[in-house]
């Protein structure tokens, strides 16, 4: 496991990025200067409009979201979002082969 030094920015993958915990964690990490990759399938377990509103707050426009493609935040240069399903093994392997978290 890598040691994290004080004042070192992290690169973090957050699953459930549009949910309550994921959204607030994203905001906190972005506020301290970390690089955040948000991942969410945007299912209808609860209000989908609330999930999209949270994504809008971090600069991800609903109409720019494309399945299995990263969307760059218009507010935070250090935030990208991808709509994908954690059960899509091929897509998850692709994400981890392209980036190191």
Label the model's feature ranges.
Residues 1-101:
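N-terminal Rossmann-like NAD(P)+-binding domain of SDR-like oxidoreductases, especially those catalyzing
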């Amino acid at each position: 496991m890598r040691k994290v030094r004080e004042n070192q920015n992290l690169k973090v993958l957050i699953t459930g990025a549009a949910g309550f915990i994921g959204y607030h964690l994203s905001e906190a990490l972005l506020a301290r200067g970390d690089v955040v990759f948000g991942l969410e399938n945007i299912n209808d377990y609860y209000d989908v409009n609330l999930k999209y509103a949270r994504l809008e707050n971090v600069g991800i426009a609903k109409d720019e979201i494309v399945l299995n493609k990263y969307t760059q935040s218009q507010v935070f240069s250090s935030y990208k979002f991808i709509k994908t399903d954690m059960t899509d093994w091929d897509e998850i392997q692709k994400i981890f082969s392209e980036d190191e978290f």
